[in-house]
Amino acid sequence: MQEQYNPSKIESAMQKRWQEQDVFTAKEQPGKDKFYCLSMFPYPSGKLHMGHVRNYTLGDVISRHQRMLGKNVMQPMGWDAFGLPAENAAIQNKTAPAKWTYQNIDYMREQLKSLGFGYDWNRELATCSPDYYRWEQWFFTKLYEKGLVYKKNATVNWDPVDQTVLANEQVIDGRGWRSGAKVEQKEIPQWFIKITDYAEELLDDLDQLDGWPEQVKAMQRNWIGRSEGVEIDFNVASSEQTLRVYTTRPDTLYGVTYMGVAAQHPLATEAAKTNPELAKFIEECKNSKVAEADIATMEKLGMDTGIKAVHPMTGEEIPVWVANFVLMDYGSGAVMAVPAHDQRDWEFATKYQLEIRPVIEPLSGDSDIEKAAITEKGTVINSGPYNGMSSAQAFDAIATELKEKGIGERKVNYRLRDWGVSRQRYWGTPIPMLNLENGESVPVPEDQLPVKLPEDVVMDGVNSPIKSDPEWRKTEYNGQPAEHETDTFDTFMESSWYYARYCSAQTDDAMLDPEKANYWLPVDQYIGGIEHAILHLLYARFFHKLLRDTGLVESDEPFKRLLCQGMVLADSYYREDEKGGKQWVSPLEVDIERDDKGAIAGAKHKQDGQPVNIGGMSKMSKSKNNGIDPQTMVERYGADTVRLFMMFAAPPEMTLEWSDSGVEGAQRFLRRLWKLTYELNNAGGACSGQSLNANQKQLRRELHKTIAKVSDDMGRRQHFNTAIAAIMELLNHLQKAPLESEADRQVLAESIDATVRMLAPITPHICEQLWQELGHQEPLSFADWPAVDESALVEDEKLIVVQINGKVRAKLTVPADASAEQVEQIAFDEEAVQKHTEGKDVRKKIYVPGKILNIVVG
């Protein structure tokens, strides 16, 4: 055994050995417990960042631990390879997106291997490969045949620079989040999948997900947004038209004082024909569409259309206003406004001096509507025959009357909208539909799949290469001219089923092999950032149910247990330029001065020795130039050190603060473990079966207490940082242990053997090497997790503290099973106890078993 720990030499040797021994190749083994561990696959942007490293280290630690517990483990890896960044990079680098993407994949694959992650590379997939997306296209055509896919014109946020549709959340202050261009409103035909058909099941099945964080489930519940209410028809005065609205508060119907309609509503369009001022306002509303989340905080603007609606109960005429807070995409694009009992309606009514009519007396008695709306429920007032009813009673009574009159009905509503999957981009999966000359659309026949994306293209930054290529667009359908759809899928499509494709990634004649898919699915452990709590995780759950209903999988849900890791933070530094802007400086270019407590007291630029400003801890990002390159850290410290720091610095779901001193501390710990093993190997032999003295028994007790704690922390609790802390504490005990006798060496050998196995999932390279140095032949990856020897935990003796009148006077070692009487006898035989009790009246003796004996004397 080498005396010095050499990470780079050990790590390259171990990685080569794992590859040669095919250690991580997963095969179906019916009858054996399986464990499918999956970390969210990366976008191949060019290089891994520390957020990736944290995510994938967590997954690898869990996978390796489960393998040592005897499970049949699968841990695959692939690439979420489509998306706009590849197009932007292609334009910038004058290359094709495909070439840029595949080069990045090759580089990042080697980065992952250098970190020692135990992936089954035979299952590797890239979503930009036709072998992958052909099945996505096939599945889409099957959904179309089932009536779950449809095409409709939809008003979209159009970015005129990126030439693409933006989600509401991608519009910031009326501008595109990526390009900064002023966003326009545009109506274009788009393809949708009916996720709303599954809204109830998606909501109900959240209750099955015991292994998911409550926060994520709450976010999905809110996004799906189930509500019970009533749909009500308001007649339009002097017209045959009706305004249909949905409300969850029919008990406030008598408080309606105006109606609000979206700028795109037909009534608004009609009124604008004869009202230029209204037409101008509507145009402004259309071009300032914002995310739904912003509506609560933005200024409420509106204009009277001059049209009146008729109250369904009182016959009163109510003004109809165009309001910028009403969205055409939600419900019917119209709302009934009750300003006394809805804060948004109250703000609008106050601004435009519309009537505010209270119809609920709150239970709290606070009924001042001058300051704000009263949103709580209570007793109905000013509502004719419903006065005196509770809100719940009035809900039922009013809903019943509306139904009897034929102008309303109860309805369960969902906030969730159907999934618009069309994107006006090139680098994505072509939507497998054909547009015929008669205006109809039909699926591409199965024998013509996949519809391949041409990869050898030149990006001009304006038009999609497939849109501007007539040869690609043109085709035939039943002998008639047709054109390929030139939109591509939302990239959430690819990431909604990749976890299932891993189960049979090499199958080329089907989307999934049901037998293999049903063996591995559902995923036992899924790991990724909480930023994916809604869209990706919701779409993947939806897709899984679609796969089930197509007969490809049997389970209802894709992921049993979900772990959302926290962000990685790092110190940031900057200098101010002449205009007061911040020029961010990489931490690698800064020399740091620390105070006595280790906090940063000052910083200087390495190049010129001049001070730089300290920007504090923030998420690692390009914008603040505070990212730490994982490759640099692996080359400097070794992969095991980086992995150990990542797992030790914080609980997995909390933010992790990068610290060079913390990384150095992690390496010192590994060097200590190496040194101790070296000393044991050079100390002479050790035979098992030696009788042990009290100190040796105590060391074994510490070992097996640690095994018990680490087993629970690594498995049930997933508190890896406390598991590592316990192992570090154990190593402190082991370093103090003598090596003189065979019994000493026997206990130390057992302890190091178990320590190496406990650390193996976290620092696999050094542990594999130490495992060999300890004399083992089989790979550590297939060794058993250390078992707790319950007999070692049984203590022969206990240390008892003796207090006399509240002061510690003696410490006794007594047999572990000693009775209170025996402990008292031993205590009173002690000289120190006799000294403080002699000639005094012993008034009371209180014994806390195994801990303390209190004696009160007078």
From Swiss-Prot:
Which EC class is this protein assigned?
ligase
NCBIfam families per UniProt: leuS_bact (TIGR00396)
Q: What is its EC number?
A: 6.1.1.4
| Protein biosynthesis is among the record's keywords | yes
- One matching Pfam family, short form? Anticodon_1
Write the record's keywords in alphabetical order, separated by commas: Aminoacyl-tRNA synthetase, ATP-binding, Cytoplasm, Ligase, Nucleotide-binding, Protein biosynthesis
Q: Which gene name belongs to this protein? A: leuS
User: Which family does the similarity line name?
Assistant: Belongs to the class-I aminoacyl-tRNA synthetase family.
As annotated in the record, motif 'KMSKS' region runs over 619-623
Q: What is this protein called?
A: Leucine--tRNA ligase
Q: Which GO terms describe its molecular function?
A: aminoacyl-tRNA deacylase activity; ATP binding; leucine-tRNA ligase activity
Per the Swiss-Prot or TrEMBL record, what residue ranges does the short sequence motif 'HIGH' region cover? Answer: 42-52
